[in-house]
Amino acid sequence: MAEAPHTLKFERLRKRPDFLLAAKAPALSRGAVFIQMRQRTDDDPTVRVGFTATKKIGGAVERNRAKRRLREAARLVLPLHARPSHDYVFIARGGTGTREWARLLDDVKTALISLAADLDRGGTKVSRRSNGALHDAAPSSQPDPTVSG
């Protein structure tokens, strides 16, 4: 792989409050990975990275395998696509542990590129609907069907 244009320092996110702050930031799902990207307000250029897997994807063995694969994918892709002073949280999805390696790397890369492009466009937040599906939280010109008037 090519070297990053600038050398970034990486640290792991380990504390729950950091994960909760990232949960309020823009996020994107691609294939077997869900990534949250939070821009910090401090002047520290360090990139902080966290990994998580819920019990929905399986038992401890499956969760650990998924997180190991996400850590390695992040180690390879983040130096090329991470932004200084940002926190990234990688959340394993159902196929993370079994997805073909090249496809998982592509999922991570395209998610990071899309999140960065979204931030450059103004950072519309991606959020969850009540049914768990993702939608763009930017204001829509469509009237809200739940509002009568």
From Swiss-Prot:
Q: Pfam families per the record? A: Ribonuclease_P
Q: Does the keyword ATP-binding apply?
A: no
Q: Which reaction does it catalyse?
A: Endonucleolytic cleavage of RNA, removing 5'-extranucleotides from tRNA precursor
Record-listed E.C. numbers: 3.1.26.5
* One Gene Ontology cellular component annotation held by this UniProt entry: ribonuclease P complex
**What is the top-level taxon of the source organism?**
Bacteria
Indicate, by first and last residue, each region the UniProt record lists as having compositional bias (Polar residues): 139-149
Q: Where is this region: Disordered?
A: 123-149
Which keywords are on file for this protein?
Endonuclease, Hydrolase, Nuclease, RNA-binding, tRNA processing
Q: Enumerate the Gene Ontology biological process terms.
A: tRNA 5'-leader removal
One annotated GO molecular function is: tRNA binding
Oligomer status and interactors: Consists of a catalytic RNA component (M1 or rnpB) and a protein subunit.
Describe the function of this protein: RNaseP catalyzes the removal of the 5'-leader sequence from pre-tRNA to produce the mature 5'-terminus. It can also cleave other RNA substrates such as 4.5S RNA. The protein component plays an auxiliary but essential role in vivo by binding to the 5'-leader sequence and broadening the substrate specificity of the ribozyme.
Family indicated by similarity: Belongs to the RnpA family.
In Swiss-Prot or TrEMBL terms, this protein is called: Ribonuclease P protein component
**Native source species:** Caulobacter vibrioides (strain NA1000 / CB15N) (Caulobacter crescentus)
Underlying gene: rnpA
